[in-house]
């Protein structure tokens, strides 16, 4: 009699990362939060648009807070405890995303603004007339 087929698959080992980097990209329209390890390998990410906010609600501080909470909770499953925060962009979700990461219990070591500043590069968009 033949044996029932069994698969020889190994259980995937979940890596544990204690120190990481939280990249917050806050544009005027959306906020993207990516949490990586020190080498830059992504552990988790979330956006304000992917968190259920659409249209003008996507560009609010509350939407950035929800996105940071979603990315942070997934990263904590990897054992993340300490983060360095890199903030890029002029958007409204800059500060609330950092506050949300702090409220999750992640220890924030330092906060760095890495917004690219042109040395007279491209012409900026025209001013809004409302």
Swiss-Prot record:
Q: Hey, which family's this protein in?
A: Belongs to the universal ribosomal protein uS11 family.
This protein is called what? Small ribosomal subunit protein uS11
Query: Which Gene3D superfamilies does the record match to this protein?
Result: Ribosomal protein S11
Q: Which gene encodes it?
A: rpsK
Function of the protein: Located on the platform of the 30S subunit, it bridges several disparate RNA helices of the 16S rRNA. Forms part of the Shine-Dalgarno cleft in the 70S ribosome.
Q: How does it assemble?
A: Part of the 30S ribosomal subunit. Interacts with proteins S7 and S18. Binds to IF-3.
Any Pfam family hit? Ribosomal_S11
Q: What terms describe the molecular function in GO for this protein? A: rRNA binding; structural constituent of ribosome
Would I find Ribonucleoprotein among this entry's keywords?
yes
Q: Which InterPro entries match?
A: Ribosomal_uS11, Ribosomal_uS11_bac-type, Ribosomal_uS11_CS, Ribosomal_uS11_sf
Q: Which GO terms describe its cellular component?
A: ribonucleoprotein complex; ribosome
* Gene Ontology terms describing biological process: translation
| Originating organism | Marinomonas sp. (strain MWYL1)
């Amino acid at each position: 009699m033949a044996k029932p087929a069994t698969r020889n698959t190994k259980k995937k080992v979940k890596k544990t990362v204690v120190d990481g980097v939280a990249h917050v990209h806050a544009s005027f329209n959306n906020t993207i939060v990516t949490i990586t390890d020190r080498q830059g390998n992504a552990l988790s990410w979330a956006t304000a648009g992917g968190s259920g906010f659409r249209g003008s609600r996507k560009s609010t501080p509350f939407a950035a807070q929800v996105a940071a909470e979603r990315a942070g909770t997934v990263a904590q499953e990897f054992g993340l405890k300490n983060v360095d925060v890199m903030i890029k962009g002029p958007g409204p979700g800059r500060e609330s995303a950092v506050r949300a990461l702090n409220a999750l219990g992640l220890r924030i070591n330092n906060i760095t603004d890495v917004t690219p500043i042109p040395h007279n590069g491209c012409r900026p968009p025209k001013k809004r007339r409302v």
